[in-house]
Structures are given as structure tokens and as C-alpha cells.
């Protein structure tokens, strides 16, 4: 298999990995340490991810407990969680921070599903852009005489197969996340 096809699959795989990460950050009404993955704390002047400053535990389905390694950073972590606008209210006793994840209303679930579909659509656009870039490169190579017309046709078909598989995988990820969100 040519380097171009390998490159195509690698780039498409990265897009799917990004989608998976984004979907993991969307809360389905259950506590999940990924909820805080995008939260950075201004710690001694440097933006630092919460995961590096504290251990994050999920003792119950709707409860996150954040135990900072440095107790003096509790207020900073709490402030960063508020600033991240996650739709949760952290409470602190000076030692640990507790976040109770609210149950999702039907309206909020539909809003999240809409957001999931948009993220999935963005991922599909990314995949199609990769396909277009690769096909343009293949046509350029054929025009320059680097590959034959038959090679162009077969590699274009391979790129299309990779695109179809990637879009199928994206659809499956989005569908699974929708089911997760809509299950009460």
C-alpha cells in the first residue's frame, strides 16, 4: 500500500481520536473525571491541568471528589472550575472539592445531543477535507507523471474506502454517545 494511503488513514485516525476525546468531555449526567480534562488552573503563574494538581475520584455516580496535592491550591482549582462554565457547582471544605453532577433535564439532554451531532458533523467535514487534499495531491502526481492513470484511479478508490470507513466510525461514535445521553 502506498505512503499516500497510509498518510490518509493516519490523518483520518487522528480526526476520529479528536472526536472521541471531545465526546468523552460531554457529560451524560454521570460523574466522570474527563469532565475536568479541559480545566486549567493558574498555578504559580503557569496554566496547569487540574489532573496534575489533584487526584480526581468518582465515589458515586453523580459525585466527583477532587483532592489537591497542595492544599493551598484548593481555592484556585475551585475558581478554575467555576470559570470553565461546566454547569456544575463545586463545593469545598478547604481540603477537598466536591462536585455534584446534576441530573440532566430532557431539554438539556436534547441540547447535548444537538451538540454531539454538531461535533460529529465537524469531524466528518475534517475527514472530507483530508480526502480532498489527498485526491488533489494524487491528481497533481498523475499530471507530473509520478503515477499512472490506473494508479490514480485505484488510489482514489482506496482513499474513498478509507473515507467511507472513517465516516461510518464517526456515525457509530455519535450514535453511541446519543444513546448514552438519552438513557435516563
Swiss-Prot record:
A GO MF term: ribosomal large subunit binding
This protein's GO CC annotations: cytoplasm
GO biological process terms, semicolon-separated: translational termination
Keyword Protein biosynthesis (UniProt): yes
Region entry Disordered, spans: 141-164
Gene3D superfamilies per UniProt: 3.30.1360.40, Ribosome-recycling factor
Cytoplasm as UniProt keyword: yes
Compartmental location: Cytoplasm
Annotated S-S bridges: none
Domain of life of the organism encoding this protein: Bacteria
HAMAP family found in the cross-reference section: RRF
Matches recorded under NCBIfam families: frr
Function: Responsible for the release of ribosomes from messenger RNA at the termination of protein biosynthesis. May increase the efficiency of translation by recycling ribosomes from one round of translation to another.
Protein's name in the database: Ribosome-recycling factor
Lineage of the organism: Bacteria, Bacillati, Bacillota, Bacilli, Bacillales
Gene designation per UniProt: frr
